[in-house]
Amino acid sequence: MDTDNIQIEDSSFRDNQGRIVYFNNRILRVVNKIGKKNLDFINESGLLDNSVKKNFLIKTKLLNLKDLPNFFSKYDNVLESEKIPFISYPYEWTFDQLKKAAIHHLDFQIYLFDQGAVLRDSSAYNIQFIGAKPYFIDLLSIKKYEEGEYWIGYKQFCENFLNPLLLGSLKGIQHND
């Protein structure tokens, strides 16, 4: 297989569990040893398939490493995600889109709590729209919930969603001005 078509996404450097890789017009996420345990939990618990079926998570599937070029053999797992037709950013969204994204994020978080899981962060950049529908795109942000654990993404949710929505609705200050 041709490895000339492999490009690592520079902006995915912050994720200590894996990286985004473009290969033959496909979007792949390579998962390292740090992310393997987490991905095993997500997959074995049914969260991967069920989160996709419930339209919380963008369509994502595990790939067989044997079907990929040797470049990928150094990783523990490789995931493929549905390609998003148009990438948008929170600072480009309307007030209503930010509100939809926030509600989607909270609905997904509540679903995950019910399944014994939690989101480790609450970045608005983990949401993308396909048409008017928001989808969560960062599978490895899901982790097993530890009893008594505080929602570690709460502060980031307030910064990325709640505060801009409050300022917009109460004071007319738009988050994207």
Predicted segments, located by residue:
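ATP-binding glycine-rich phosphate-binding loop
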Residues: 1-24, 63
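ATP-binding glycine-rich loop module of kinase domains
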Residues: 17-42, 91, 95
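Short, solvent-exposed loop/turn segments at secondary-structure junctions
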Residues: 27-28, 33-35, 64-65, 126, ...
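Conserved kinase catalytic-core helix
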Residues: 42-55, 94-120, 164
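Conserved structural core of kinase catalytic domains
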Residues: 56-104
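Short acidic, glycine/Ser/Thr-rich loop/turn "cap" segments at secondary-structure junctions
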Residues: 84-97, 108-109, 120-124, 139-147
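Catalytic activation segment of kinase domains across protein kinase-like and atypical kinase folds
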Residues: 118-172
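A conserved mid-domain beta-alpha-beta active-site/ligand-binding segment of alpha/beta enzyme cores
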Residues: 174-177
